[in-house]
Amino acid sequence: MEEMKQKWTDMLTEFQEQAGLTDGSLLVIGCSTSEAAGSRIGTAGSGDWAELIYGGLNRFKEKTGVHLAFQCCEHLNRALVIEAETAERFRLPIVSAVPVPKAGGAMASYAYRQMRSPVLAESIQADAGIDIGDTFIGMHLKPVAVPVRISSRELGEAHVTMARTRPKLIGGIRAVYECE
């Protein structure tokens, strides 16, 4: 697992180099620890993988100042585990549930227990996202999502995709998008 810990740190560093997240950015994480461990999504949640992934993301948060949002599984309608201060800052209505491994998922459950004042939000519009194990986080990203390609596309046995967002380009043929 020590090798995976370093790989995860490297992946996050490479992601940040391209995504350029700043203090106050909102980052959504969808994660199947089952997939990371080599099993089918939702069948073998792993506390060890949740700990490794959360640890890397927490260090990433400390370096960048981003706010983390961990997507629950479909049994909690893909609600998001966030800090109460994040809900307040982004004016997100909270919903009532406590994620557990079999209803919320191992990752969301672990994150909930690590946070100082965890709450669940029904939905968000994040500035960027990381999807570990094809959990489908697109519903929680701002338009317009832009793929971030890094050199490694797997963590453990899980497929990893990453995205940042950009403002919509509006206007017609006369629109200008950069100052001259």
Curated annotation (Swiss-Prot):
Pfam families, alphabetized: DUF436
InterPro entries hit by this protein: Antibiotic_NAT-like, DUF436
Organism superkingdom: Bacteria
Family: Belongs to the UPF0340 family.
Protein name: UPF0340 protein RBAM_034070
Species of origin: Bacillus velezensis (strain DSM 23117 / BGSC 10A6 / LMG 26770 / FZB42)
